Amino acid sequence: MGVTGILQLPRDRFKRTSFFLWVIILFQRTFSIPLGVIHNSTLQVNDVDKLVCRDKLSSTNQLRSVGLNLEGNGVATDVPSATKRWGFRSGVPPKVVNYEAGEWAENCYNLEIKKPDGSECLPAAPDGIRGFPRCRYVHKVSGTGPCAGDFAFHKEGAFFLYDRLASTVIYRGTTFAEGVVAFLILPQAKKDFFSSHPLREPVNATEDPSSGYYSTTIRYQATGFGTNETEYLFEVDNLTYVQLESRFTPQFLLQLNETIYTSGKRSNTTGKLIWKVNPEIDTTIGEWAFWETKKTSLEKFAVKSCLSQLYQTEPKTSVVRVRRELLPTQGPTQQLKTTKSWLQKIPLQWFKCTVKEGKLQCRI
């Protein structure tokens, strides 16, 4: 996984851990949980010894749970790549935990998969589980597959993040982002640390600019979902499709969709029309603001906790998230009043592109 933590608790150590560590490990035995302290609006790794081993953690009110999206670590987010990280399995009960705050996601997913006999592959979402509330692009995949198992799990042990709830399984027709859940340790209990309240409008009703962000749904058709021979089609309309490739970015697909409409390339019969993109066409168009906001730096650091000698003997490589400062002439998209923390909205800016002589020409 992309997130490397600083503390691991093997199964045979469970009975000897304190209540604090037991709370941390609730999330999953195999996880490495990053621990940190908020100082001056940044997430910094701090000496766990100062808080735990010297009894400075006075109550669980000093813990704040956050959802961290995998895409911030640079994992491939295109549909063919992302779906390979998920797999069906039986005999393992699903688990759900809550988290208090999260990031804005660039890519989310929504699955409606059926078996060849027409039965559903994925369970319906339990009461109270709603879709991830902040997605720039929602990749909605419909189709069929063998679905050899009761539930779809994450092969790398990550969670599927929903609206302030994280589950180990995928629910039918419910938008999710891939991620992990981690605790932040505050120097002292702060009631107003996360002061902003999430908006409650559904993801598909955000075209009003006053809502503060845009969400676009991109639709796909899948056959053989969950197998090595899965085929994906990008849906332009119910009769016009494009063969999907991993190199296609969401921005390229939207540009391609507009090009097919404006150039009259849609199916004009009752039959299905499937296009294939010329391999020479540049598909690397993307939103620079997203990756600027998600910049990460790799640093070496050693755990100095009194527990470190039990569980870790050498420094680990960890991902430290750094918030990008806007230039004085720049401003973020309209947003709700919030604390000055590293959990911020993604300033959305995008390219405008035209197709001339078979080549994409883009400008900001």
From Swiss-Prot:
Gene Ontology cellular component annotations, sorted alphabetically: extracellular region; host cell membrane
Disulfide bonds: C108-C135, C121-C147
Record's keyword terms, sorted: Cleavage on pair of basic residues, Disulfide bond, Glycoprotein, Ion channel, Ion transport, Secreted, Signal, Transport, Viral ion channel
GO molecular function, one term: channel activity
InterPro entries named in the record: GPC_FiloV, GPC_filovir-type_extra_dom
One Pfam assignment: Filo_glycop
Family indicated by similarity: Belongs to the filoviruses glycoprotein family.
Domain of life: Viruses
Protein name: Pre-small/secreted glycoprotein
Entry keyword Glycosyltransferase: no
Sugar attachment sites: N40, N204, N228, N238, N257, N268
UniProt KW NAD keyword: no
Upper classification of the organism: Viruses, Riboviria, Orthornavirae, Negarnaviricota, Haploviricotina
